[in-house]
């Protein structure tokens, strides 16, 4: 997950500033003038904002990035509320969006129905036998949940024009193996909350107290066994170790306790002849468990997985139990989001491009696409110049890097071709969960149907209304959805320094992902190919390890350190994004000069603008959760650790040896 913004070169060069004051860009109220840039730059740049925005109990983290997401959500709320109040023709996108939203808002009906909407399927799951387990797992994988493992259709890592079936580790409700294996107090608290949650769900569907307790313990036991065999998140950063190809016959021979042909048939796929198993040891454990677990234990595990998936779309009792573990225990949130936000998430995700098309028509200025392309082109030139001037890389590898850079596909705003939702319906006579499930199944069927088809490289991995951006190594593309192309990241009334420090860094960040510890293993066509000389690869790794060690040295809470290995790709992208955006900024008229605005030089405004992007308040629980599961560093480290490698940052604020923010030249890292 990555971030981005909109900006146009033409706009920026037209915004040259004279001495004076602007009310756009850097806001002095965001600063904490009781400290200094050389002591703690994050506190200096963001302390005022953090003080003015105490954490609302519905959030575990809230920052300027989240403010932007909230602005986008308010736009979506206005759009969807209007649709929900209209009489829309049956089968139209307006009808589907409006009706599914209204059903989520109908708390009276949801509470009166209780567990009733899922009981037919629960009875079906209760009938599973070991002989029919493959078909049952396939039933669950069609949009409901991912018991034991997960599967999906994606581009072949070594032949990006062809779709391939992947089998991957999953089945752990807490998301990460460490939540099952670590013994620190916070992790134990999370496990206890999860056990309590499972117990409640079983009682909600009629289990007696003692039976519910035993069933919950069975679920935790199975998931803990899966966790023991799971790859760590650090190990999962190495794609080469997760590319293990089997024919269907070879797959069956390797994991004989599961009928793979029956499983794939259950997914509607009779043409599976090549399968990639991403985590071999994990699937060995799954195969072992299928053999050794009692039928009753398998049933209880599958039943829990089903109820867990349905809980957010049922009565308040289910919602509150779900919130207690996944939000309160894991993240430190104190109250649930209002119902309208939760209800909005359904059409926004499960009818995403349909909502996105309506969103773009109403809120996205057509000229923004052109302006953004100009800015991306400018940043691409700056990165190309930096690659050409690298002292640690050989000419041969530089040529390959530049070929890849110049082959980037750029997607801006919204797709040229919209997804067709005409085959799925929303029926208000059915329950909310039944309708949500129909949408989820439609989505899963669409994904699985891509097997045997050429990779659709025009397809987007995010909806247009998403406040985010991404780089996809399999298509060598960078994408900036409409949702991120708005203030405060791109502000046409702000000066170049502020725009380059925000959106410019974001664009540079996405580009640098093509050359981070994962992206560098893919060529210009999106294939996993080694295009590096052996010596250059070693030099890159040496620099990356040095950067990773800087982050791992940081304590995030109590005695817990950041994980510089797990966050390596994002750290490299932040570092590269800063250097590339700064290089591009220095080509603007403002960047070439030294005119003060509000008492700050252009370079100071650039770095303040970057820091303000990451201003946020966050709970301790969320800090610990993100350190386990999020490949991005915490906001404070994205500012303080990244900037301490930049000599231009030291020069901008007069930071010298002896200041806490200073890093000696020999200890700094420069990769891209």
Language model features: what each stretch is:
Residues 83-374, 378:
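Noncatalytic, helix-rich "gating/capping" subdomain that lines the substrate-entry/channel surface
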Residues 69, 219, 254-257, 276-280, ...:
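Intrinsically disordered, low-complexity linker/terminal regions across diverse proteins
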Residues 1-21:
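Bacterial Sec-dependent N-terminal signal peptides
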Residues 20-29:
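Short, Gly/Pro- and small/polar-rich lid/capping loops
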Residues 58-80, 210-229, 499-505, 598, ...:
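Short secondary-structure subsegments characteristic of cysteine-rich extracellular domains
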Residues 30-51, 180, 184-203, 568, ...:
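Hydrophobic/aromatic-rich, well-ordered segments within soluble, folded domains that form packed cores
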Residues 35-39, 44-109:
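Active-site-surrounding "flap" and adjacent substrate/cofactor-binding loops of secreted or lumenal enzymes
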Residues 28, 52-56, 151-153, 176-178, ...:
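Short, solvent-exposed loop/turn and secondary-structure capping segments
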């Amino acid at each position: 997950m990555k971030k981005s913004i909109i900006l146009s070169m033409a706009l920026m060069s037209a915004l040259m500033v004279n001495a004076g004051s602007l009310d756009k860009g850097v806001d002095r109220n965001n600063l904490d003038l009781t400290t200094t840039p050389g002591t703690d730059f994050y506190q200096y740049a963001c302390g005022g904002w953090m003080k003015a925005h105490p954490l609302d109990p519905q959030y575990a983290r809230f920052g300027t990035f989240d403010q932007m997401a909230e602005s986008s959500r308010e736009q979506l709320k206005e759009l969807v509320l209007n649709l929900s109040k209209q009489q829309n023709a049956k089968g139209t996108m307006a009808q589907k969006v409006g009706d599914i939203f209204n059903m989520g808002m109908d708390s009276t009906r949801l509470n009166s129905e209780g567990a009733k909407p899922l009981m037919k399927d629960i009875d079906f799951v209760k009938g599973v036998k070991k002989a029919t387990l493959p078909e049952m797992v396939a039933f669950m994988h069609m949009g409901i949940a991912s018991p034991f493992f997960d599967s999906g259709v994606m581009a072949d890592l070594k032949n990006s024009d062809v779709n391939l079936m992947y089998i991957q580790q999953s089945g752990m409700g807490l998301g990460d193996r460490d939540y099952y294996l670590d013994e620190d107090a916070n992790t134990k608290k999370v496990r206890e909350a999860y056990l309590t949650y499972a117990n409640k769900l079983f009682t909600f569907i009629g289990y007696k107290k003692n039976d519910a307790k035993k069933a919950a313990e069975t679920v935790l036991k199975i998931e803990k066994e899966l966790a023991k065999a799971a790859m760590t998140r650090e190990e999962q950063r190495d794609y080469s170790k997760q590319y293990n190809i089997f024919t269907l016959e070879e797959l069956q021979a390797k994991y004989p306790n599961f009928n793979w042909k029956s499983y794939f048939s259950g997914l509607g796929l009779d043409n599976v002849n090549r399968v990639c198993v991403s985590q071999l040891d994990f699937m060995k454990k799954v195969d072992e468990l299928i053999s050794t677990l009692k039928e009753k234990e398998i049933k209880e595990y599958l039943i829990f997985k089903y109820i867990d998936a349905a809980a957010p779309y049922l009565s308040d009792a289910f919602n509150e139990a779900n919130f207690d573990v996944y939000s309160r225990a894991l993240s430190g949130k104190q109250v649930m989001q209002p119902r309208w936000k939760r209800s909005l998430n359904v059409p926004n995700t499960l009818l995403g491009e349909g909502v996105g098309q309506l969103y773009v028509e109403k809120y996205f200025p057509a000229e923004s696409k052109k302006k953004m392309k100009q800015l991306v082109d400018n940043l691409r030139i700056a990165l190309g110049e930096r690659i050409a001037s690298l002292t640690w890389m050989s000419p041969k590898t530089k040529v390959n890097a530049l070929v890849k850079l110049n082959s980037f596909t750029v997607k801006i705003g919204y797709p040229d071709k919209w997804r067709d939702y005409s085959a799925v319906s929303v029926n208000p006579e059915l329950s909310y969960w039944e309708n949500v499930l129909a949408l989820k199944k439609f989505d899963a069927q669409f994904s699985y149907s891509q097997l045997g088809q050429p990779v659709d490289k025009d397809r987007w991995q995010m909806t247009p209304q998403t406040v985010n951006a991404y780089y996809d190594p399999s298509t060598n593309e960078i994408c900036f959805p409409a949702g991120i192309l708005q203030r405060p990241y791109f502000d046409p009334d702000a000066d170049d320094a502020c725009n380059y420090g925000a959106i410019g860094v974001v664009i540079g960040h996405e580009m640098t992902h093509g050359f981070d510890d994962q992206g560098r293993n893919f060529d210009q066509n999106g294939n996993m190919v080694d295009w590096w000389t052996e010596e250059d690869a070693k030099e890159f790794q040496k620099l990356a390890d040095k950067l990773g060690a800087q982050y791992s040295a940081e304590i995030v809470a109590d005695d817990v350190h950041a994980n510089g290995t797990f966050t390596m790709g994002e750290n490299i992208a932040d570092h590269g994004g800063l250097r590339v955006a700064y290089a591009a900024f220095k080509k603007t008229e403002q960047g070439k000069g030294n005119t003060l605005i509000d008492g700050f030089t252009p370079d100071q405004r650039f770095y303040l603008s970057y820091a303000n992007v990451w201003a946020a308040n966050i709970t301790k629980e969320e800090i610990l959760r993100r350190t386990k599961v999020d490949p991005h560093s915490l906001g404070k480290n994205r500012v303080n650790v990244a900037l301490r490698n930049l000599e231009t940052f030291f020069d901008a604020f007069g930071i010298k040896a002896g200041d806490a923010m200073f890093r000696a030249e020999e200890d700094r890292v420069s990769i891209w």
